């Protein structure tokens, strides 16, 4: 209760960052809707984007803190992704009689991109809850924590792409000019990562049972994607 009172002391009455709304949510009081809700949300997104030095540094610190005493650091995720891709690629290429030289790079890239999607959804469901203390102490736009999350997932995505580059060097699949679509597609991934993380973050902050439900659904959804069922792409 004292934390909430302290928060109220640092949140101005004309706050446009949404910090006051989240403080009320943590206190258990549902935020009151008003005619400026969308304007305040847009203002928060803009102000959060302008605080790029803050969320870039926080995202980088998240990775350093998580793997502080690890020899390989975040590359453990890269290794795990590579092993998973190799196992799934070999298994499903045999089951579905797919060409391994095409299917294995396909599964590898799919797993890497799915890791980004799943990270934005699952971590997004916890983005405000996990940063509750920082939100109460730091008078910054709430979107800073969302940008921080997406930036962190982008860093994971970047070094996981090493696996795919290795697959390209080994199997040399024909990509053609369509391969250039990766860059606009990546931009769409980043934009969608922001709103998805913010959406699930808001819902999970109000309804705490949403986060574990989201975790289960994300794991289930993986097996419903064209990453594994390559035959769907040929239809």
What role is predicted for each listed range?
Residues 1-233:
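Hydrophobic transmembrane alpha-helices and immediately adjacent juxtamembrane helices
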